Curated annotation (Swiss-Prot):
PANTHER family: UPF0319 PROTEIN YCCT. InterPro entries: UPF0319 (IPR018635). This is UPF0319 protein NTHI1987. It holds the Pfam family DUF2057. Residues 1-21 form the signal peptide. Belongs to the UPF0319 family. The keyword Iron-sulfur does not apply. Keywords: Signal.
Length: 221
């Protein structure tokens, strides 16, 4: 009897402390830009799924991409980055956005993103949704830095625990005269955001692209 009680007690303890992982995917018109403070990898972009802990809060940045218009008037609509914060679930989750058929609908989506999080069985999951405001010449390359600032602000969909993670994975701007690169990071200097982002993308490019860019810059002096 004592042995049975011990076994039952251990089973109850394990059940109460166990965590379960669910898969998160998106509707076909959404792409992941960042996941829990980390940049979404290219391989994940193709698979469009990742695993979450059902006991933790999770945060993703997504963008809606949709062909709008018809015939010769077709064009690609890309939304502003949208932050979605939600609680993990043992069941698989789907983050969805409605289809956008024209630019007017796209503008409305940018102003008030309509994004839902549901389980595979159709149950709605509470989520906080907000637009990630961006500035600069190449805003798409600055998602992690902007997200770190957002999470530090305490805004509606912010998650404070991801602030440090995001900052560590974003580019680092340093004052002029102190531009020695840190290993594993892209370090830039400049008087304004545009200059910093030009330097960032230059360092991201391969040697051939850098050479072409320098030749182009010389020809446009």
């Amino acid at each position: 009897m004592k042995l049975r009680a011990v076994v039952l007690g251990l089973a109850t303890l394990c059940t109460s402390t166990a965590t379960f992982a669910g898969m998160v995917s998106t509707s076909s018109n959404l792409e992941f830009l960042a996941i829990d403070g980390q940049k979404a990898s290219k391989s994940l972009g193709k698979a469009k799924t990742f695993t979450v802990d059902d006991t933790q809060s999770h945060q993703v940045v997504v963008r809606l991409n949709e062909i709008v218009g018809s015939g010769s008037n077709q064009s690609l609509f890309e939304s502003n980055p949208v932050i979605v914060t939600f609680q993990g679930n043992a069941e698989d989750l789907v983050i969805s956005a409605p289809a956008i058929r024209n630019l007017d609908s796209g503008d409305k989506f940018n102003q008030m993103p309509n994004i839902t999080v549901k389980t595979k069985s159709g149950n709605a999951i509470s989520a906080k949704v907000d637009v990630l405001k961006q500035e600069g010449l190449f805003p798409s390359g600055n998602v992690l830095n902007d997200l770190a600032e957002y999470n530090a602000s305490g805004a509606a969909a912010s998650v404070s625990k991801f602030t440090a993670t995001t900052s560590a994975n974003s580019m680092v701007a340093v004052p002029a005269g102190n531009a020695k690169a840190n290993k594993g990071k892209v370090v830039v200097q400049g008087e304004n955001v545009a200059e910093q982002q030009l330097q960032y993308w230059f360092q991201q490019a391969d040697k051939e692209t850098q050479t072409r860019f320098l030749n182009w810059a010389k020809s446009h002096k």
